[in-house]
């Protein structure tokens, strides 16, 4: 492993277990190359793309719950867009826009955008992009509600629930 790779892994391990979800953890991930906006919370034991951190972009006022996993490539499946030299290109693979809430244990797969104000419920697996102000749930994650207001760190939960509109299920029961 190269010195840069060792540095990346050391910063990643420090970020997993450091205190300071809104201070130290985001700062360590920024040093790894993850683009992280202001006032973003990174939960304990959250793993953000181990090998290609520069392929992840996280907006302002985002909350990542405990044990969130964000993957930005599939090296072993050969789905990467590689350059002629065999290296991954520098395109962002995972984009999390402003005011997004991602619940504990959620998994974000490569090549998705999570739109402004979206909510990913706990344990969900996001395999496709999520529309702005939409709540998704399940494996694979599917839209279950429209959010009238983002679930921000400063948003009273009663206000969030008051503006939540369920999406009618299209599946037969």
Give names to the regions the model predicted.
Residues 1-33, 39, 61, 74-77, ...:
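Terminal amphipathic alpha-helical/low-complexity segments used for targeting or macromolecular assembly
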Residues 72, 121, 127-128, 144-146:
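Conserved acidic donor-binding loop of glycosyltransferase catalytic domains
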Residues 59-65, 117, 121-123, 133:
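Outer-envelope exported proteins of Gram-negative bacteria
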């Amino acid at each position: 492993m190269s010195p840069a790779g060792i540095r990346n892994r050391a910063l990643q391990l420090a970020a997993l277990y450091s205190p300071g979800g809104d201070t130290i953890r985001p700062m360590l991930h920024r040093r790894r190359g993850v683009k992280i906006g202001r006032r973003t919370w990174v939960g304990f034991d959250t793993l953000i793309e181990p090998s290609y951190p520069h392929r992840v972009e996280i907006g302002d006022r985002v909350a990542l719950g405990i044990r969130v996993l964000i993957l930005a490539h599939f090296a072993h499946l050969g789905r990467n867009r590689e350059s002629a030299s065999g290296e991954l290109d520098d395109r962002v693979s995972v984009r999390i826009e402003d005011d997004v809430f991602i619940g504990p244990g959620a998994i974000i797969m490569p090549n998705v955008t999570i739109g402004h104000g979206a909510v990913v419920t706990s344990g969900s697996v996001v395999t496709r992009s999520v529309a702005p102000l939409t709540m998704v749930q399940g494996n694979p994650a599917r839209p279950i509600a429209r959010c009238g207001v983002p679930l921000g760190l400063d948003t009273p939960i009663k206000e969030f629930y008051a503006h939540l509109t369920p999406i009618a299920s299209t599946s037969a029961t």
